[in-house]
């Protein structure tokens, strides 16, 4: 997932860590996870599915429509990553996530409007853990 977001232009360690922390909180990076923790296919879930637990009808069905249109499975990591970065919720914050030099708390503020979580949980702690583990390389 890190490589994918870097390829999308997100280079800042704290921005990447915030994205990873949110995905870990939502799904533990398990693409075929349904709300509540069961592992199942997209069509067997209904709502609250995947990497960021797409819950609202438009976002959940948007994942399925995207997969059908582009020939992927809505239950796989590559399809979900591609869908995630095409959603309007992501597009609204994408430029801010690409802007370097912000704190995790600031990036987390942006991420809320992207994911709209009901429970904050450990996402900020996870983000700090990732920030401590990520290595940035100047090229």
Which functions belong to the PLM regions below?
Residues 1-10, 65-74, 95-96, 112-122:
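Second-shell loop/turn segments in exported
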Residues 1-28:
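Export/targeting segments at the very N-terminus of extracytoplasmic proteins
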Residues 1, 15-19, 77-80, 84, ...:
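Stable alpha-helical elements in mature extracytoplasmic
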Residues 98-139:
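Active-site or metal-binding loop neighborhoods of secreted/extracellular toxin and effector enzymes
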Residues 21-25, 36, 113:
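Short acidic/histidine-centered micro-motifs embedded in hydrophobic/aromatic stretches
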Residues 27-101:
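Peptidoglycan-targeting cell-wall enzymes and recognition modules
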């Amino acid at each position: 997932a890190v490589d994918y977001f870097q390829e999308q232009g997100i280079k800042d360690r704290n921005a990447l860590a915030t994205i990873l922390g949110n995905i870990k909180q939502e799904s533990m990076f398990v693409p075929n996870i349904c709300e509540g923790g069961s592992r199942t296919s997209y069509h067997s879930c209904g709502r609250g599915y995947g990497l960021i637990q797409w819950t609202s009808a438009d976002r959940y069905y948007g994942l399925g429509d995207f997969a059908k249109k582009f020939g992927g499975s809505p239950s796989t990591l590559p399809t979900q990553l591609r869908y995630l970065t095409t959603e309007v919720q992501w597009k609204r914050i994408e430029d801010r996530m690409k802007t370097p030099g912000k704190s995790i708390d600031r990036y987390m503020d942006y991420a809320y409007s992207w994911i709209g979580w009901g429970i904050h949980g450990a996402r900020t702690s996870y983000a700090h853990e990732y920030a401590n583990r990520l290595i940035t390389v100047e090229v």
